[in-house]
């Protein structure tokens, strides 16, 4: 992983696209290049999804990472459209080798040969293009020379000819890291918010449907015997879309009783705290804990969270929600700074805020506040392996979002290859006089229709 720890990761692509799985099958059959052996070479045709489908940490990305970090990817050649029978999609040839010559080691060549073709005299389904012998020779020579060739535009501004670039393996890699912002919440007990607690969050719609039809009967054991067949048929209906585990859960009386107990506990809190609107969620949770303690109500962590989530919501005017206040001695601060590559005064950029600086009463110098992050405001950045994560944060994030911090534990390593990124050529806008003359010519051909439309 990012910290250098070995890990077992997913290397299975999605079931709808098995191209990379077939490629890995071929990789597994490669002969060894050790002990003077020649090793193996692979040429495999893919569509564009193999280049970039899958986020960091996904099966597709991990397969690309495995191939590139082992230095097996030699080159990728983009082919012209309509080169294959019955498909017009863009295709690519992946060239792999486990015995690269020294000059190609640690590098990957990308060749854009999408404009290297000649038209067939007669179409074969979607196939209307082919390589000429000269095209093949040009592509082969570009590969053998490991040449860097700049793409060209013709007189009409359209791409023409071949283009080629050579990259270091790590140029295709990136770190994906979460950018967190503090949660700010308002809270208020209301009849509507408490009523929602009657139902489990994961089964809210289904439980509501059942309760509307049968009411408080759902809390009686004989209900599940009396309507056993009807309930089973209802739960298994395609309309409800319930999994086996969900069907079992919703037809278990304990599920209903547990939710009823949670709702009643919330009513107790409501009676004690009233319907006051709290703009400081930290104060609100303290009051909730005091009421629970006074009434000797013991809630599981998930039950407590369900109540708090039901009666609170994000509001940018609220106070920041404190997750915890921790004590960091000098050795712990040094360890964190070494891990994050920062100075003690920069720990706030990694989610550790000096308690004295953020207004915590009676805070000690070695106490730090850790805020709850807002899932609604969470963002992620993809940062090249060639750039430091913290340097990127200071340059691209901190100037725009002062409250943001890096979640360094969320880092995932990804790999993707974008031909458009490397071979895109800007096409200059056409001259206005040229456009006007073309319109006038079309006007003549259309018997003045365009002139009438333009009011001229």
What are these language model-derived features?
Residues 1-451:
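A conserved structural/catalytic subdomain of Rossmann-like adenosyl-cofactor enzymes
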């Amino acid at each position: 992983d990012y910290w250098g720890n070995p890990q077992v990761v997913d290397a299975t692509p999605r079931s709808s696209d098995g191209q990379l799985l077939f490629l890995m099958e071929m990789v597994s059959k490669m002969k060894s290049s050790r002990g003077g052996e020649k090793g193996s070479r692979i040429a495999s045709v893919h569509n564009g999804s193999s280049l970039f489908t899958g986020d960091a940490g996904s099966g597709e990305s991990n397969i690309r990472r495995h191939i590139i970090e082992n230095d097996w990817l030699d080159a990728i050649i983009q082919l012209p459209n309509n080169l294959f029978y019955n498909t017009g999609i863009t295709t690519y040839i992946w060239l792999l080798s486990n015995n690269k010559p020294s000059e190609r080691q640690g590098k990957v060549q990308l060749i854009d040969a999408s404009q290297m073709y000649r038209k067939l005299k007669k179409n074969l389904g979607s196939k209307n293009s082919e390589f000429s012998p000269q095209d093949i020779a040009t592509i082969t020579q570009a590969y053998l020379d490991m040449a860097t060739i700049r793409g060209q535009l013709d007189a009409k501004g359209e791409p023409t000819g071949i283009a080629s670039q050579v990259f270091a393996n790590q140029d295709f890699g990136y770190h994906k890291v979460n950018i967190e912002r503090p949660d700010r919440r308002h809270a208020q007990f209301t009849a509507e918010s408490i009523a929602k607690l009657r139902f489990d969050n994961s089964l809210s719609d289904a439980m509501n449907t059942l309760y509307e039809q049968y009411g408080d009967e759902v809390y009686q054991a004989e209900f599940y015997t009396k309507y056993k067949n009807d309930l089973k048929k209802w739960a298994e209906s395609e309309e409800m879309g319930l999994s086996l585990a969900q069907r079992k859960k919703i037809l278990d009386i304990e599920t209903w009783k547990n939710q009823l107990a949670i709702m009643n506990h919330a009513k107790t809190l409501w009676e004690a705290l009233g319907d006051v609107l709290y703009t400081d969620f930290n104060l609100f949770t303290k009051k909730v804990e005091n009421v629970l303690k006074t009434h000797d109500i013991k809630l599981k962590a998930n039950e407590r969270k369900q109540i708090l989530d039901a009666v609170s919501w994000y509001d940018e005017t609220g106070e920041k929600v404190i997750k915890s206040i921790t004590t960091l001695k000098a050795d712990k601060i040094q360890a964190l700074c070494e891990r994050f590559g920062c100075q003690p005064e920069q720990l706030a950029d990694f989610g550790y805020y000096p308690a004295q600086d953020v207004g915590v009463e009676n805070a000690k110098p070695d106490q730090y506040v850790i805020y709850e992050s807002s899932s609604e405001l969470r963002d992620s950045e993809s940062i090249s392996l060639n750039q430091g994560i913290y340097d990127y944060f200071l340059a691209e994030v901190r100037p725009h979002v002062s409250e943001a911090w890096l979640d360094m534990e969320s880092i995932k390593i990804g790999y993707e290859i974008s031909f458009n990124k490397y071979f895109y050529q800007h096409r200059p806008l056409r001259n206005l006089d040229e456009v006007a003359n073309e319109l006038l010519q079309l006007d003549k051909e259309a018997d003045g229709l365009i002139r009438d439309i333009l009011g001229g």
